[in-house]
Amino acid sequence: MNWRKKAIAGWKKPWLHNGMKHLEKQFSTIASAEHEPQSLKNLRNSAFDSFKKTGFPKKNWEAWRFTTVADLVKTPFRLSTEADLPEVISKSLDNLPFPTLLFVNGHYQPDESTQPKGINVNTLIDSYNEDAKLVTNGFDSGSSPFTVLNTAMMNSGLHIRISEDFENHTPIRFLYLTTKLSEPIMNHPRLILDMADNAQANIIEEYRGDSSDSYWNNAVTVIRTGNNSKVHHVRIQNEAPAASHLASTIYEVGAKGAIHGCFISAGAALYRNDVNVTLLGERADVTLNGLCLSRETQHMDHNITVDHTSEHVTSRMLFKYILAEKSSAVFNGRAVVRSDAQKTDADQTNKNLLLGNDALMYSNPQLEIYADDVRCTHGSSTGQISEDALFYLRSRGLDAVSAKALLINGFANEVVDDINNEEIRDYTRRLFESWLSGVTHG
């Protein structure tokens, strides 16, 4: 494209230019922080230069064909500071009895948090000073531009070490609350969990908002397992209706290690999660389940890559979407099997239920195989509620609303029932039932 065409393109979309200028202004506030080491400032500057060079995602990017960030870019989000904390902080919004590490408007609240025995909690700054690779370690390479932006602007976060002695029957919850504020804010949290060899843990990562105004969370979560360590990770995205939630979830699984990830999404006007899994050691295993619940004009997008790099590794992927009204969603699932990953066993399935004629679903399961002794399958299906099934339930005495709700429940239960912890499972089911009630009775 020559300079004239570039000028015309820029004139047609001045909001892209204005959005970048606004981010530059916000970046300057964190880049000038006095308490940070110079090496971290250099890292931030390098990452932001990289983000500016790449720019915001464009429609001609294959992974972003069906997701636009135009409304997000047009909104002048301000980077949150500790001055944005409410006068009274309360997490008593539910009855979950789990140890909870609480973030409010992007900022960790140690005095309001409960830390279980057997884990070590450090701020990102402390871990960076100990070893920069603990916080970065090449996560930005080939990733979403928003992961790079998180590196540049990460304004909160924790590094967690979980030892072999940790009693995994007690789940650990990381709760991110966004409260009502007078102007749109953004946060770039980073959560890193390192599992020792033979360690086990149940993790809940939850995002919630009670603001009716727009805000933006751009989160990065990294879970690294040691050899023979096991993690159950439930990620719940239930942001406020006007929020934007962009995320990068990174799993690195060691030999004989296993991660069971479950992604529940019901909130935000715009939601996108780039999930990148690397099976690093022999007999590493990953399970990825997802349940996306969208309505009105919500848009939800999962872009998933599972990289099989060693022999005898297994992966299972099941993502289900339920779309109501004029909502839309995207599923991109990609399994890569390297030449050294013989005996790989990989399966991915995407099933989608449309509750109306105006909902839109884009599904693209992919296999990329460079080994010859593997078992790999993938499939996708999209449809509406069966009229025959509805008729049968009506003939058994159910009213139309109850019959519809029963069928939708049956569709979702395959994901919810696979959550291993009963209290987390019940909590997730209540969230789903609340959403379903709004759809069927609203």
PLM region descriptions:
Residues 2-220, 224-230:
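Short, low-to-moderate order helix/coil transition modules at the start of elongated helical scaffolds
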Residues 120, 127-398, 412-442:
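Conserved beta-strand/loop scaffold segments within soluble protein domains that form the structured core
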Residues 37, 45, 50-53, 96, ...:
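Generic hydrophobic-segment detector
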